Amino acid sequence: RCHTETWKREIPHNDYKRMLESVKGGITMKIAVIGGAGVRTVIFINGLLKRCRKLDIDEVALYDIDRDKLGIIQKLCAHVVSRAGGELLVYAAQDAREAVTGADYVVTTLRVGGDHSRTMDEEIALRCGVIGQETTGVGGFSMSARTIPLLLEYCELISSCAPNAWIFNFTNPSGL
C-alpha cells in the first residue's frame, strides 16, 4: 500500500498520526528531511524501507524551498515505496514547521545558494590556485558563511516544534 500526497490530503496529518498510534499501540516514528528535493532523498527512502518495520518508522516529511523539485522527488519516493510494497507515508510538507512538528529525527541536507553558489565558490578558489571543493578550504568557508545562519534558524524551529528530536546534519561543509 502506497501513501501518496493525495491520500494524505484526505486524512489530515494529525488524524493520520493518531490512527497510526492507535493501530501500533502508541509507537510511531516520524523523520523530517529538510532539503528533501535532493536526488539522494530517493536513495534515503529506499534505505529506510529496508528498516522501517524494524524501527517503527511510519512517516517521512520532506521539505524544500524548491517546491517543483520537491513534488517530483516526493512522487519518485512514493513510487519506490509502492514498488517495494511498503507502508511508509512519504509526503511533501507545505513548510518547514509542518515537516519538523512532532518529528523524532530531522535530517538536514541543504545547499544554500544551490549549485550556482557551489560553482562560484569552487571557481574562485581554483583561480587563486587552491582546491575549491565545498567541504573544506576556501569553498567550504564560503559555504559555511551562507549555511550556518540558516541551519541555526532550523535548529531553533526544531527546538520549538520537536524538542526531543535528534538532528542528523548531512549539509556541507561537513569538514568545518
Which functions belong to the PLM regions below?
Residues 31-56:
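N-terminal Rossmann-like dinucleotide-binding module
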Residues 89-102:
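Short acidic low-complexity segments
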Residues 104, 111, 172:
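Short glycine-/small-residue-rich Rossmann-like dinucleotide-binding loops
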